[in-house]
Amino acid sequence: MTASHAVHIGFVSPNAKWGAHYDDLLALVPDGVQVDIQPLGLYRTSLNELSEAGGDHLAKTTQLVAERGWAGVAVTGAPMQVQNKDLPERLRAATGVPVTTALESSTAALRALSAERALVMTPFDASMNALVGEYLKGAGIDAVFPETALGTGPGALALSADEVYELAKGALMAASDVEAIYFQGARLNPLGCLERME
């Protein structure tokens, strides 16, 4: 498949800037697929600001689909979805293209593994983790969050693959009866150590 015939997918983030984890993600994209990563700049200091950003997300993403001819959209950032629960359906209706979210796709992956209890690693605070846990509970998955702080927001960007591995290893040893480890929040980037974890 030539580049001109590649499937063109939008990957929209509520963040305002390009994260280093995007480079790791793009390295996984197969031939024949073009992924446009588009930061939308929907919050400045706190993920809680996203509770008021659903309309802006909808407008910006709908415009990008029309301008760039995206065949589908991946909406990143669990905090966006858990604070704007109707956003995925509104995006599907407004854009007319398939839309998935971080939570929807990750939940589907956990179900494919028949995992009913997962250790959930995030760079979020306790209140945001509670919302993520509520979503997962509604999907039939018992979420277990580590007792130790993983570093929230931009601080999580400074973690090396070795540090992410050690955090996950320690959290797994402290958790009971989990069937999977689920990384939510790519700022806590596990891509450099997934094979070692498995």
Predicted feature descriptions by range:
Residues 58-104, 108-109:
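Glycine/small-residue-rich loop that forms an oxyanion/phosphate-binding "nest" at active or ligand-binding sites
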Residues 2-5, 66-68, 107-116:
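Glycine-rich phosphate/diphosphate-binding loops that line cofactor/substrate pockets in enzymes
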